[in-house]
Amino acid sequence: MFRYKQVMVIRKDLKLSKGKMAVQVAHGAVTAALKVQKEKPEWFKAWFHEGQKKVVVKAENERELFELKAHAEKLGIPTALIRDAGLTEIPPGTITCLAVGPAPEELVDKVTGHLKLV
């Protein structure tokens, strides 16, 4: 049973290729995990040792990512907002993904529980 999880939220409106989406999600997962390891080491250790549960969901647009980020931060959940370098499919600086946690599952669900899986 998982008590901690990490959720990556990808923008639907960008219509990223599967490969591009995978890379953006990976950037988010690593960046946020390192942030949590530093800011909430007890959460990181628990998440890491129970199998590192990750979920990928979708948001409508950039505005929704910022709303989710603000909600997560109000609850004390570290986040990572990912901006693309713009070398392939989209313009430089485009915000593609928000990573939430890893954090206690019940907290993360308050932020992302209503979003649909990719």
UniProtKB/Swiss-Prot annotation:
Name the UniProt record assigns to this protein: Peptidyl-tRNA hydrolase
Chief place of localization: cytoplasm
Keyword field contains Metal-binding: no
GO molecular-function terms, A-Z: peptidyl-tRNA hydrolase activity
Role summary: The natural substrate for this enzyme may be peptidyl-tRNAs which drop off the ribosome during protein synthesis.
EC number: 3.1.1.29
Xref: Pfam families: PTH2
Reactions that this protein is recorded to catalyse: an N-acyl-L-alpha-aminoacyl-tRNA + H2O = an N-acyl-L-amino acid + a tRNA + H(+)
